[in-house]
Amino acid sequence: MNISATSQSVPEVAIFAEHLVRRFGEFTAVNDVSFEVKKGEIFGFLGPNGSGKTTVIKMLTGLLPLTGGAAQVEGLDVRTHAEEVRERIGYMSQKFSLYDDLTVSENLTFYGRIYSLPADRLKRRISEIVELNGLGPYLDRLAAKLSGGWKQRLALGCAMLHEPKLLFLDEPTAGIDPVARRQLWDLLFELSGHGITFFVTTHYMDEAERCSHVAYIYYGKLIADGTPNSLRELRDVQPPGTLRVEITTPEVTRALRFARQNPGIRSATIFGQSIHALIDDHFDLHDLREQLLKEGIAVAEIRPLAPSLEDVFVELTYKHQALLEASRA
């Protein structure tokens, strides 16, 4: 992918990233990362804590210089047009960064003035955002008195005041309850329907399932990039000659120990009251049940299972952990 050439001919692409590298002294935080984000997409950027997600966002928004590689955001080179990039995008940080001692209305007005919005446009935008984000009942409430979910709605509203077509959201639902998370995602889908592009970092797999495109970064390296459906079909996730099954049991710890010692089971992970296991497809499920029962492990059900995104990322993580350990040996 050649950014300078391609970006001129593919106007529907909001972000190009090519061979991004970021080093801090001897430590490489981002190592040869390339991807693209199409306009109107909700692009999920996943990875464990410390994997480089926030560093990539800071590089793409011009807040952190690139050590190597190149990137364009909304058609602008982040190396040479960082200020213009920041004028065209919205950014919502991982932590609530608005003013606790200002009301909802005062926060919106303050950030609108930071964006130098004319008074008439600011009034219009505040009215639109209050209606869209449901902030009307809270206009006179101090930000400090809002629940986590409403704080995030306010932060999103402030990031949208200048009508950006691209929004970077760094773990926007961290620390808020499941209902508020779902409501915030419903709002993102509504905004996406109006042509707004979202670059969202998250470590919630149910949120990743809702993205139109997903990339997974692990210790600075991009190890998966595609639609949720295409990632489920990766050979690394379910190689030929294997079957993924769910073993439902009240004794998940013992069942996991059994699975990891069984030569016919390639991998196994606990998911609630069940085990997700990748087995050789010649392994008869009735025989598997009998082996578990012989070990004194009660089994409620064993059934074939389509891989979830969580299965995908667990398998990819195991593989790359093994590669890292082998390279250090």
Feature map (PLM): residue ranges:
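Conserved ABC transporter NBD signature motif
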Residues: 69-77, 85
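Conserved ABC ATPase "signature" region
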Residues: 109, 113, 120-138
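Conserved ABC ATPase signature
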Residues: 142-146
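Conserved catalytic motifs of ABC-family nucleotide-binding domains
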Residues: 163
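Catalytic Walker B motif of ABC-type/P-loop ATPase nucleotide-binding domains
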Residues: 167-170
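ABC transporter nucleotide-binding domain
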Residues: 186-279
